[in-house]
Amino acid sequence: MRILVSNDDGYTAPGLEALVQALQGLGELTVVAPETNHSGASNSLTLNRPLTVRTAANGFICVNGTPSDCVHVALTGLMDTRPDLVVSGINNGANMGDDTLYSGTVAAAAEGYLFGIPAIAFSLAEKGWAHIEAAARVARQVVERQVAQQLAAPVLLNVNIPSRPFEAMAGLQVTRLGKRHPSEPVVRTTTPYGDTVYWIGPVGLAADAAPGTDFHAVAQGAVSVTPLRLDLTQHSQLDEVRRWAEPLCASL
């Protein structure tokens, strides 16, 4: 089995190292990760400059681009053989609910999924790398279980792991995405030169953390596994939009 591993925290991140170590023995690993932290990069690709690729001292391949760049370059320019699985993480912090739209960790996995490859994004629910070894142990078990399945189509899984000892994990739940309140306002400050600058504010608290959501599972101490899709079509509104757009359809 061939596994492509990436992340968004950068090629020196403890979460990436822990994940790679945990996956040893499962197959041939290729690690391609960003040169610097690209948290919040979402699915962006770098189109306005060329990308450089080098092998770092730790043996990982690093790219001066986004997480999506890393997976795209790996799949279309670096790997001679298509991988059987793309794995991203382990992220320093949760990627639940609305986070998935912004997450570079999820985006790296999604890039593989766009190429028709099963993919899994792993995140540690609290920042700071506490219990990262336990999270890596969970990640290995999820990967082992996923690759053992004979699924009709590739899956894209978003996995959030509580920051706690392995023995204290309260099981695993298959969940839907919850929802956050809007982010906090930007933080305005002034540079020593008198210029006004703005920092993006903290993420909002959970607005939908009902049973069955990723927020609820992690709050209960359980690992959350959410299958994702990339079709953003709101199918339930197609007929409604067709009705109000009908005059335009006839006149344009």
UniProtKB/Swiss-Prot annotation:
Its cofactor is a divalent metal cation. It is an enzyme of class 3 (hydrolase). Its main location: cytoplasm. Pfam families: SurE. It is found in: Cytoplasm. It comes from the Bacteria. Its EC number is 3.1.3.5. Transmembrane segments: none annotated. InterPro entries: SurE, SurE-like_Pase/nucleotidase, SurE-like_sf. A divalent metal cation binds at D8, D9, S39, N91. GO terms for cellular component: cytoplasm. Keywords: Cytoplasm, Hydrolase, Metal-binding, Nucleotide-binding. Disulfide bonds: none annotated. It catalyses: a ribonucleoside 5'-phosphate + H2O = a ribonucleoside + phosphate. One of its GO terms (molecular function) is 5'-nucleotidase activity. HAMAP family: SurE (MF_00060). Belongs to the SurE nucleotidase family. Nucleotidase that shows phosphatase activity on nucleoside 5'-monophosphates. This is 5'-nucleotidase SurE.
